[in-house]
């Protein structure tokens, strides 16, 4: 693009026009959530403290994701581009968790704004070890992180000091938890969000029983950001997990009172409801009928980018979807 070209930014969820930013001189092809260099970015919204939203920002989470894909060749480069963008133009959305990956690395980055009229965001990004798996499901997952490990951890310079300034944290740096400071846990975050992460960890590790009390509200000790699985996961393993309804666990919704004679794993919204003044809730599984689409990203360093990146894409509920492979350089 010629120098000085501007890019109009529209909010992903509503189509609302947010403003203009300077376009990069060169951008890369993007198919779904993967670009031509196999860089892949996914997200879940955790919301966090409502007073930190900034409606004057230009960059919303969806634009941040796709502009990051258009401009990056590695996961680390995507993190720098995304954080530079919100620092320059302001962050419009609520708290967000991003999975940012390339053929060699996977990072979890969490970000939240600083409040009305305050440009920028506080954020932290942690690299997932090669022998581990991680997950996030609409609740902030990063607690303590090693501020001295520059190779595996990146963060905004004020991520701790801003929390102190706002009164969210008053301990020593090593005890700082991004999640507790910026997205305090409530019942919904634990049972409807963290429970989905628990199901994933329960499926592929032997630690599920140790983490279940946290999901049930019996302890406040959180699950780790990442864990070592019992075996290396395949593409099929991840597809199957996206179809999960807590089958075979204490949270299996095909066995509760709402399952009916056919043991259906589906429930109508809302998750909470009242009968005769008594409040009840349905479990919120990974697979749900409210889904618009689902994907599994396969990134392969041992193959050329042209055929190395495959986006296994399906529409609607993952349990009903057919995963169709699309190469990252498809036109």
Question: Language-model segments: which ranges?
Answer:
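A contiguous strand-loop segment
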Residues: 1-60, 81-233
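Intrinsically disordered or highly flexible coil/loop and linker segments, enriched in small
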Residues: 91-95, 251, 304
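Hydrophobic/aromatic-lined pockets within catalytic cores
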Residues: 69-73, 83-91, 300
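Second-shell loop/turn segments in exported
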Residues: 51-55, 63-72
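Accessory, solvent-exposed terminal regions and/or long lumenal/extracellular loops of proteins
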Residues: 202-278, 284-286
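Substrate-recognition/cap regions that form aromatic- and gly/pro-loop-enriched pockets
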Residues: 262-331
């Amino acid at each position: 693009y010629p120098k000085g070209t501007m890019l109009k930014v529209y909010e992903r969820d509503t189509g609302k026009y947010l403003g203009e930013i300077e376009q990069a001189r060169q951008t890369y092809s993007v198919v779904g959530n993967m670009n031509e260099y196999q860089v892949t970015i996914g997200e879940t919204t955790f919301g966090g403290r409502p007073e930190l939203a900034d409606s004057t920002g230009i960059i919303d989470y969806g634009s941040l994701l796709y502009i990051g894909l258009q401009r990056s060749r590695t996961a680390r480069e995507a993190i720098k581009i995304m954080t530079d963008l919100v620092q320059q133009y302001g962050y419009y959305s609520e708290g967000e968790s991003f999975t940012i990956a390339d053929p060699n690395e996977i990072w979890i980055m969490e970000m939240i704004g600083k409040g009305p009229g305050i440009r920028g965001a506080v954020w932290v990004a942690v690299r997932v070890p090669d022998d581990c798996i991680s997950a996030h499901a609409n609740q902030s997952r990063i607690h303590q992180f090693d501020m001295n490990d520059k190779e595996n951890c990146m963060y905004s310079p004020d991520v701790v000091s801003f929390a102190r300034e706002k009164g969210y944290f008053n301990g020593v740096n090593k005890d700082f938890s991004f999640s507790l400071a910026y997205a305090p846990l409530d019942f919904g975050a634990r049972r409807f969000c963290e429970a989905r992460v628990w199901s994933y960890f329960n499926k592929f590790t032997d630690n599920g029983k140790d983490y279940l009390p946290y999901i049930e509200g019996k302890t406040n000790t959180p699950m780790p950001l990442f864990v070592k699985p019992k075996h290396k996961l395949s593409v099929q393993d991840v597809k199957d997990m996206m179809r999960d309804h807590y089958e075979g666990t204490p949270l299996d919704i095909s066995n509760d009172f709402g399952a009916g004679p056919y043991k259906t794993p589906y429930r109508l919204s809302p998750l909470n409801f009242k009968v005769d003044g008594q409040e009840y809730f349905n479990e919120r599984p990974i697979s749900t009928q409210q889904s618009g689409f689902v994907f599994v990203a396969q990134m392969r360093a041992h193959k050329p980018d042209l055929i190395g990146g495959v986006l296994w894409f399906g529409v609607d509920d993952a349990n009903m979807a057919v995963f169709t492979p699309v190469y990252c350089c498809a036109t």
